């Protein structure tokens, strides 16, 4: 399936890909990826919907945030930018750090979110606490959550070695790393090899303490829009669903079989099918 996307720069300087027509869908990627993480999913969605895949401030090809990297602030920046392009309520889809942003977005602007989808992520302040020492199979998936928060050291160790870091992450966090194409790997390295780009990505992790406090406050009111929570079988599995059942009224989801963390790239047809079926039911119920 092919669907041509066009490049777009939103009012806040965020880089985006846009395709299709119909009810609006916004796709938010995580780190160390970009809007292109949705390349394989976007054609399926754009056949029925008006789709915007956007790089959050400081990630991918977007400009830096001028208001910090806590997800409460980032989500407000994206809401302001997206609202001018898509004034109607949106289906919001998110992955990894993008899900941190999307949860805060939905909590602050519930009237704007027609449905919320979270893909393989653990929300700061709301995910179950881990005890030390972490089991090796857990540590290999989560170590960067602590490493990326450290001052200065991540930049010292990764400058000029962005490719080596990303290749390690893809190899160890994916069930099917080869499904992340070489062209996309090259694109991600190009994005994050630019001056200051890695620091901007690390800033999301360095602000997780602030984001966590915001999330704890947001969680006092359950989300009321339909929520789809999906984890890769060797990633979050059904733990994301169980977590979201405490945070939202109408939740469904589970685990994507034969899949790791990078769900859109590893199992694009499964993810697309689940999303389209979910959107259709939501729209039918709301019509």
Task: Show which residues each predicted segment covers.
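Flexible "cap/lid" subdomain of the alpha/beta-hydrolase fold that forms the substrate-access gate
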Residues: 2-7, 14-16, 24, 37, ...
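Short beta-strand element of the alpha/beta-hydrolase
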Residues: 23-29
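Conserved phosphate-coordination/catalytic loops
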Residues: 32, 72, 266-269
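Catalytic histidine-centered segment of alpha/beta-hydrolase-like enzymes
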Residues: 259-272
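The serine-hydrolase catalytic nucleophile loop
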Residues: 31-40
């Amino acid at each position: 399936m092919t669907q041509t996307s066009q490049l777009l720069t939103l009012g806040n300087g965020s880089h985006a890909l846009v395709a299709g027509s119909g009810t609006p869908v916004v796709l938010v990627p995580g780190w160390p990826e970009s809007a292109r993480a949705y390349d394989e999913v976007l054609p399926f969605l754009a056949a029925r919907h008006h789709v915007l895949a956007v790089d959050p401030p400081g990630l991918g090809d977007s400009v830096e945030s001028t208001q910090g990297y806590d997800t409460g602030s980032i989500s407000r920046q994206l809401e302001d930018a997206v609202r001018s392009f898509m004034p109607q309520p949106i289906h919001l889809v998110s992955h990894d750090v993008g899900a941190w942003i999307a949860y805060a977005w939905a909590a602050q602007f519930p009237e704007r979110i027609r449905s919320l989808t979270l893909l393989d992520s653990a929300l700061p302040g709301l995910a179950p606490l881990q005890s030390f020492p972490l089991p090796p199979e857990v540590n290999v998936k989560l170590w960067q959550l602590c490493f990326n928060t450290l001052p200065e050291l991540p930049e010292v160790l990764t400058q000029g070695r962005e490719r080596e870091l990303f290749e390690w992450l893809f190899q160890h966090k994916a069930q099917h790393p080869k499904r992340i194409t070489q062209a996309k790997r090259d694109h991600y390295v190009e994005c994050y090899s630019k001056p200051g780009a890695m620091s901007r990505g690390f800033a999301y992790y360095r602000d997780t303490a602030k984001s966590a406090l915001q999330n704890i406050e947001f969680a006092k009111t359950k989300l009321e829009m339909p929520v789809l929570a999906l984890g890769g079988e060797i990633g979050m599995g059904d733990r994301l669903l169980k977590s979201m059942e405490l945070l939202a009224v109408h939740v469904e989801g589970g685990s994507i079989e034969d899949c790791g963390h990078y769900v859109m790239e590893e199992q694009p047809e499964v993810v697309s099918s689940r999303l389209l079926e979910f959107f259709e039911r939501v729209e039918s119920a709301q019509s």
